[in-house]
Amino acid sequence: MPSSSAIVAPSDYEVAALGQVFTPPAIVDCMRKLVRNTGRVLEPACGDGAFLQHLPGALGIEIDPRHAPPGAEVMNFFELSDDEAFATIIGNPPYVRYQDISPGTRRLARGTVLDKRANLYLFFIEKCLRLLEPGGELIFITPRDFLKATSAVPLNRLMFELGTITEFIDLGDLHLFDDATPNCAIWRFERGNLTRQTRYAALGFADTAETLAAPPWGERRFLESGGHLLFTRHDYPLRLSDIAFVKVGAVSGADDLYTSDAAGNRDFVCSSTVADGLTRRMIWCEPGEPPPEALLPHKERLISRRIKPYTETNWWLWGRGYYVSDLPRVYVNGKTRRAQPFFVHDCTNYD
């Protein structure tokens, strides 16, 4: 999300293709306070220079010449040689789905630990890790979901191997970006720091941008489990992986079309099941089966789904299947404000 000192993004910013979103001054100030190192500084997606204007002598890189500030290098960040090294890398990397990343950037970003499920901001993180000198710091604002995203598992393992996230500010539901999703986090990573000690702050519903001037810090332990990054209050000798494994549910990409009491052929545990205990009757399509009659009128919409490549031979299939097993399980409603997101249910199908 390339940066600027304004809050409202103008219409000429390329949000979908380039991930261009303005960085509010309160965010910039908070992130600048996390800088500890002296030495060479890089802002890899500098936009109009929200950070760069406070960092004399820093190298700024911006792919869009319309917004590059004076002195910035107008280039694709992934063209920067890995032989470069920086004491501090700071900024707001672009949030772009893989399918929307330009072909040129895709080619340049090949050969990383990531794959075609990864958002562009994850490729930025991976590239920055290679550019950090020993003891170097990476200070970013990103979606917080990388901590537990399946697409980020190899990157998270690499980060944990290389160092520690020394500061992490969960911004909660603060709407700091116009026309952009909340659920972001500000964090600082230090290469070579293996203390596993993290200063952690979580902003609540009543907090405002002013809270960033003095975050409510607490001490946490930085852990990695199954490629997921955690900030825990204690060390836990028993890991979830010792007694269970985690699987994610199916994704249709069009629940309103696949949900049908009349044409459905399988009951699914869904996000509302935790509240009412009810399952959802849905149209399930096994690979190799012909398209269900109920979906034929919706072919044009279904083939245009972007969760995976669709053609004339598979347009009726779900975007992602689910692990089929009769093993006992505990369901977790992953995106909820419920204090108790865990529940059990006899149904073994889940989305």
Give the predicted meaning of each segment.
Residues 8-32, 45-70, 77-252:
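Signature of N6-adenine DNA methyltransferases within the class I
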Residues 35, 178-180, 322-323, 348:
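Sterically constrained small-residue positions within well-ordered secondary structures
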Residues 35, 80-81, 128-132, 193, ...:
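Proline-centric
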Residues 39-45, 56-63, 268-269, 331-332:
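Short, hydrophobic beta-strand segments that form beta-sheet elements in well-ordered domains
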Residues 40-41, 88, 137, 329-331:
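Residue-level preference for the first positions of well-ordered beta-strands
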Residues 229-351:
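Polybasic, glycine- and aromatic-enriched phosphate-binding surface used to engage nucleic acids
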